[in-house]
């Protein structure tokens, strides 16, 4: 299972990063792939109740990659963390295959409550740079979260959300091809910028 997940992670990197040249280079140099591999080892030890060892491994991964993933987080194969520095994934988070996470993104909790307090990210979601997804809700399949957005409630499938707090600016047809390329991310970031400018104009008018 470990090696299957690793292969899926490498395939996800090749599919989503135009700078990726070959599998060997990705395996050797991509911090996101390294962080996910470390995490799966930590997750194994966490499941068999060796929690201190799991935390030590996760902290080593954080030191070497700049990506912090709690050893209890559930992450499927085929996830791509691009650039990765500053990414944080909390204890009860779940991330499904096809998800792309950019640098500085946080899958965090709210408050000090126990139990499910981090988000569930369904398949083929894009979480842009600096976005914060906070709480124990679900981000639906194929959703896009704009750069710097702060998401505090459930996101429907195929929705694009931007702003602080995040709001829906578009819901795509489920039959549309999900665009997780860099061009697609730029379009999402542009929507985020436009929404921010609109908010500033509204505040000035008030």
Residue positions per predicted region:
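Generic, ordered loop/turn and secondary-structure boundary motif
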Residues: 29, 34-37, 70, 108, ...
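C-terminal segments of enzyme domains that contribute to small-molecule binding surfaces
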Residues: 115-134, 138, 164-206
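Left-handed beta-helix
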Residues: 65, 70-71, 76-77, 82-91, ...
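Terminal amphipathic alpha-helical/low-complexity segments used for targeting or macromolecular assembly
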Residues: 1-65, 176-206
């Amino acid at each position: 299972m470990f090696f299957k997940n690793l292969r899926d992670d490498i395939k996800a990197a090749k599919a989503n990063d135009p700078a990726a040249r070959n599998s060997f280079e990705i395996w050797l140099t991509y911090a996101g792939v390294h962080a996910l591999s470390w995490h799966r080892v930590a997750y194994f030890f966490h499941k068999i109740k060796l929690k201190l060892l799991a935390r030590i491994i996760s902290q080593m991964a954080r030191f070497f990659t700049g990506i912090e993933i709690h050893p209890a987080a559930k992450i499927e194969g085929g996830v791509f963390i691009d650039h990765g520095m500053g990414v944080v994934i909390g204890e009860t988070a779940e991330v499904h295959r096809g998800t792309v996470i950019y640098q500085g993104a946080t899958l965090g909790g709210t408050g000090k409550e126990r139990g499910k307090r981090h988000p569930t990210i369904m398949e083929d979601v894009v979480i842009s740079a600096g976005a914060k997804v906070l709480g124990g809700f679900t981000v639906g399949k194929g959703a896009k979260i704009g750069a710097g957005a702060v998401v505090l409630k459930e996101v429907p499938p195929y929705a694009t959300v931007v702003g602080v707090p995040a709001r829906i600016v578009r819901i795509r047809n489920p039959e549309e091809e999900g665009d997780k390329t860099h061009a697609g991310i730029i379009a999402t970031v542009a929507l985020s910028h436009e929404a921010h400018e609109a908010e500033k104009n509204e505040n000035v008018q008030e």
